[in-house]
């Protein structure tokens, strides 16, 4: 076994403890995540306008905010694209995934925060690797090289705008 695999195995063993907690207590983990997201969003303009408070219940959130379609959210996105901060996410949003334009035949911009890249994509990739390494202890997958391909992107007004794959590749911290 390589040194790299030994180090990764140690890291992944610790990560598997957290993953096992997610499996054993999904309701508790979901409630904790909801509270964190509500606390972060309460101080944005979207949060204030919709009465989002740090101690809001999921039921109250659903009643106050409801389901939002793209057109109702578009003015917030346009302001974030223009560089305004604390609109619908804390701070500045500098990453935007561009959709292929399936519903109205136009591209849509999806705000992507660096925090969401970390929690959803970086840690998600690490968790997938941890589960794989746990299931296949003799794997040599981490001894090789990888090739990652992404879509196109542009920089506008200090923001990175492009295919989700390009946005993720350019912003991910590699494992």
Language-model segments: residues:
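Nucleotide 5′-phosphate-binding alpha/beta core
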Residues: 1-98, 104-173
């Amino acid at each position: 076994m390589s040194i790299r695999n030994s180090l990764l195995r140690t890291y992944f063993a610790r990560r598997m403890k957290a993953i096992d907690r997610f499996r054993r207590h999904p309701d508790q983990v979901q409630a904790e995540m909801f509270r964190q997201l509500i606390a972060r969003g309460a101080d944005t303009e979207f949060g204030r306008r919709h009465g989002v408070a740090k101690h809001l219940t999921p039921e109250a959130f659903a009643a106050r905010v409801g389901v939002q379609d793209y057109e109702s959210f578009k003015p917030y996105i346009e302001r974030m694209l223009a560089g305004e901060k604390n609109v619908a996410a804390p701070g500045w949003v500098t990453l935007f995934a561009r959709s292929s334009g399936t519903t109205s035949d136009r591209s849509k911009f999806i705000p992507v925060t660096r925090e969401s890249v970390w929690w959803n994509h970086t840690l998600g990739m690490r968790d997938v690797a941890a589960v794989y390494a746990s299931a296949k202890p003799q794997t040599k997958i981490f001894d090789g090289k990888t090739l990652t391909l992404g879509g196109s992107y542009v920089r506008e007004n200090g923001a990175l705008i492009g295919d989700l794959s390009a946005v993720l590749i350019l912003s991910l911290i590699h494992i």
